């Protein structure tokens, strides 16, 4: 669920998804094309790929069980879709934390028109 993903991002990075990640680069936020601009954008690209493997699941709105404790995100037991969506979100939030040192404010509201060329394959 998007609100749960936002909480994971905030837990890992101490930044709100909006405005820091919702429109970042070519892949953070809705859709994406071209090459990821940097490590942060690549986290979003990989997250999009992860969701892409879950076509039968309601990735944006399915609510899943998880906890934020002792510095870790733990996905709980749920339906197959819930568990997979949670793992996609957990891995992406941790990736965004690892990419904080190279976060570029210039990519924060990056125009889609500048995302050109073929998309990478997942």
UniProtKB/Swiss-Prot annotation:
Known tissue expression: Expressed by the venom gland.
Compartments in which it is found: Secreted
Residue stretches spanning the membrane: none
Activity at various pH: Optimum pH is 8.0.
Cofactor note: Binds 1 Ca(2+) ion.
Record EC number: 3.1.1.4
InterPro entries in UniProt: PLipase_A2, PLipase_A2_Asp_AS, PLipase_A2_dom, PLipase_A2_dom_sf, PLipase_A2_His_AS
S-S bridge residues: 26-115, 28-44, 43-95, 49-122, 50-88, 57-81, 75-86
Keywords assigned: Antibiotic, Antimicrobial, Calcium, Disulfide bond, Hydrolase, Lipid degradation, Lipid metabolism, Metal-binding, Neurotoxin, Presynaptic neurotoxin, Secreted, Toxin
The keyword Hydrolase is assigned to this record: yes
Protein residues bound to Ca(2+): 27, 29, 31, 48
Main subcellular location of this protein, as a coarse class: secreted
List of catalytic residues: 47, 89
Catalytic activity: a 1,2-diacyl-sn-glycero-3-phosphocholine + H2O = a 1-acyl-sn-glycero-3-phosphocholine + a fatty acid + H(+)
GO annotation, biological process: arachidonate secretion; defense response to Gram-negative bacterium; lipid catabolic process; negative regulation of T cell proliferation; phospholipid metabolic process
Keyword Ribosomal protein in record: no
Cellular-component GO terms for this entry: extracellular region
Cofactor(s) of this protein: Ca(2+)
Gene Ontology MF term list: calcium ion binding; calcium-dependent phospholipase A2 activity; phospholipid binding; toxin activity
Function recorded in the entry: Snake venom phospholipase A that has strong antimicrobial activity against the Gram-negative bacterium X.axonopodis. Antimicrobial activity is not abolished by EDTA or p-BPB and is therefore not strongly dependent on the enzymatic activity. PLA2 catalyzes the calcium-dependent hydrolysis of the 2-acyl groups in 3-sn-phosphoglycerides.
PANTHER family per UniProt: PHOSPHOLIPASE A2 FAMILY MEMBER, PHOSPHOLIPASE A2, MEMBRANE ASSOCIATED
Designated name of the protein: Basic phospholipase A2 A
